[in-house]
């Protein structure tokens, strides 16, 4: 198929699996020349390349297939990038790529046997295949890395799973703390959308409820806010809540599924040029094409963000230089995500190997002979793992706030504080 010819530049096909060339180097020699420590990192990635899809004049790939294929290749680029950095640091790493999508008869060209020996399995990306893969991956004892957003319920009873995309519920504290510290004198408006965001909106509201001593979760008794209920067709009386005599701060957790609310929010703000308005919004706002730069700039739009590259850091630039050498371009979102996830898993597996009961290494040996700080590090994604449920999987809880400032997204903490609001005559 056309996919096979396109993919040849990235990996070679086996009869049953897509097999990336094994990246191996000589066994790592640590500080003691008489001591050789061998660590081999085995990775399996299950990605939707649609390599079994037979393209004909009457059977063309859908837009969704093409998009998933694009994401798969980009993710593979990130995996290869991480593997190259691990190899360059002196470690053995083997990467095997399996086709996620079954053939026209619904038959997968991989089985549980293909997973045996894997330390880490990344993917699948699509819900149907993902659900079927959880038990086989658990049985072979591999860590299961999810690189797409999934329902948290999937983590129940699956301690071997790690979901790398931060759960949205963990950015609520960040927004609340920022408002309490910087906007406690402002007019706070909480624009709700209901629907799929209702649980998250309730969590946010709970943060500000006063306890029996008259304080909320953050020890404050002074902050109150207006609640405006939005719907698919309107943002309620939001326009009436914007005052010319006081800075207004609008908080909305509306996601892509409630894009009409965000569209109406933008329209209301832009039609009122006498009010100073700031906006705290869901991370999805950044991905909506109808949100214009003028709105982002005027409102100093602030979003929870994950995956920001520090382009001024020399170590980061060196790592990206490896990607540029491989692909003659800068890494995009899915390449960054899979690269960082694999490096995080590699470091965790290496430490587990060194400290396992079967290992003869003691703590002093690990600290002196293995300089763990010199391991290749992540580029954009920080990981702060939280076990979601008892005996359940882990979710990344790491978020930072990013503000649109001077026509670009900047880490909020790096931007100078706001001047006090001045009422103009």
Model-derived segments and spans:
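Extracytosolic ligand-binding ectodomains
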Residues: 6-425
